UniProtKB/Swiss-Prot annotation:
Xref: InterPro entries: ATP-grasp (IPR011761), ATP_grasp_subdomain_1 (IPR013815), IMP_biosynth_PurP (IPR023656), IMP_biosynth_PurP_C (IPR009720), IMP_biosynth_PurP_N (IPR010672), PreATP-grasp_dom_sf (IPR016185)
Top-level taxon of origin: Archaea
Domain ATP-grasp stretches: 107-315
Chain residues that bind ATP: 137-189, 211
Record-given protein name: 5-formaminoimidazole-4-carboxamide-1-(beta)-D-ribofuranosyl 5'-monophosphate synthetase
Pathway(s) the chain acts in: Purine metabolism; IMP biosynthesis via de novo pathway; 5-formamido-1-(5-phospho-D-ribosyl)imidazole-4-carboxamide from 5-amino-1-(5-phospho-D-ribosyl)imidazole-4-carboxamide (formate route): step 1/1
Binding site for 5-amino-1-(5-phospho-beta-D-ribosyl)imidazole-4-carboxamide: 21, 86, 231
Known catalytic reactions: 5-amino-1-(5-phospho-beta-D-ribosyl)imidazole-4-carboxamide + formate + ATP = 5-formamido-1-(5-phospho-D-ribosyl)imidazole-4-carboxamide + ADP + phosphate
Enzyme Commission code: 6.3.4.23
Cofactor binding, note field: Binds 1 Mg(2+) or Mn(2+) ion per subunit.
Function text: Catalyzes the ATP- and formate-dependent formylation of 5-aminoimidazole-4-carboxamide-1-beta-d-ribofuranosyl 5'-monophosphate (AICAR) to 5-formaminoimidazole-4-carboxamide-1-beta-d-ribofuranosyl 5'-monophosphate (FAICAR) in the absence of folates.
Length: 335
């Protein structure tokens, strides 16, 4: 991508993303920092919604089954692509790896995100506590959660109380999955920013996911599911911040060692905090997560610690792009 970036006019950069997930936050932040903005919608109905916002300059409808054409059009527009969960789900990790447009972050990490076993191996490489992973139902000796590969927002995940229930449920599955130990405690999702400009890992915020049939009004009548419908704000105990930052740094080092590229931009570690205050990480996202939407427009509680002013993640991305462009470091941000 470095050759494409060299051809870009740095005075006319555009920021683009798929019209979903965190697009409003990303594009609002980009416009605030003076960039042209492009939203790429799945269909015309979605496009109409995004066209109402003043900070979005152009709204396209794109063919996600053949994203290469859209990527080439983005390059012609001097655009930088910001990936998020809907991009991974709609376009697919294989197309995302090959899309010929500068893309924020460690693009190769998308391949690892698509495989739940590789994800857990990477967390283990980082020296971060993880839940037990069962390769076979015969190993199970307690409650477990079954999760599918890919960015699905929790859709289809289910809990089994033991081996017999698990074996019965697995017979109906037709896609790849992982069986993990079910953890008891408080869910907490940590937002980080890896900055090539400032040479640091920032703890930027945290959230709790609000999940249908787990957190909703079911009164015990509905089977638990884990479809994410929104996110709740979370301010962590200050005594937890050093270990959370340490895990973020260790993860970044493991990515560089095992995946072969440096983290750049936002990422997330997803965890359970147990009653002894220990943290077990069961998932990661190598790009911006929807939980950052909780402080859109008024800034994360930790952004003031780094910049002495409130900043949301969309603004943080735009800030890094602006400073990287000035310093000639865009090729450290985009792959």
């Amino acid at each position: 991508m470095s050759q494409i970036l060299k051809r870009y006019d740095l005075d006319k950069l555009a920021v683009a993303t798929i019209a979903s997930h965190t697009a409003l936050q990303i594009l609002r932040g980009a416009k605030k920092y003076g960039f042209r903005t492009i939203a790429i919608a799945k269909n015309e109905d979605i496009a109409q919604f995004y066209k109402q916002f003043f900070f979005i300059d152009e709204v396209w409808t794109g063919d996600f089954s053949n994203f290469r054409k859209t990527a080439e059009r983005l390059v012609a527009e001097n655009a930088l692509l910001i990936p998020h969960g809907s991009y991974v789900e709609y376009v697919g990790w294989r197309q995302a790896l090959e899309a010929p447009v500068p893309t924020l972050g460690c693009r190769e990490l998308l391949r690892w995100e698509a495989d739940q076993y590789k994800k857990m191996a990477l967390l283990e490489e980082a020296g971060i506590p993880i839940p037990r992973v069962y390769r076979s139902p015969t190993e199970v000796d307690g409650p477990v959660i079954v999760k599918f590969f890919g960015a699905k927002g929790g859709r289809g995940y289910f809990v089994a109380k033991g081996r017999e229930e698990l074996e019965a449920r697995l017979k109906a599955l037709g896609e790849e999955y992982i069986i993990q130990e079910y953890l008891f405690g408080v869910p907490a999702y940590y937002h980080y920013f890896a900055s090539p400009v400032y040479s640091r890992i920032e703890v930027f915020g945290a959230d709790i996911r609000y999940e249908s049939n787990v957190d909703g009004r079911t009164f015990g009548w509905a089977e638990p599911t884990f479809v994410v419908v929104g996110n709740l704000s979370l301010v962590l105990r200050e005594s937890l911040l050093p270990i959370i930052h340490k895990y973020g740094v260790q993860f970044a080092k493991a990515v560089e060692k095992r995946v072969g590229c440096r983290l750049a931009g936002p990422y997330c570690l997803e965890s359970i905090i147990k009653d002894d205050m220990s943290i077990v990480v069961f998932e990661f996202s190598g790009r911006i997560v929807a939980g950052t939407n909780i402080y859109m427009g008024y800034g994360s509680p930790y952004s003031v610690l780094y910049f002495d002013k409130p900043m949301d993640m969309g603004e943080r991305i735009a800030h890094e792009i602006r400073e990287a462009a000035k310093a000639g470091k865009l090729d450290q941000l985009f792959t």
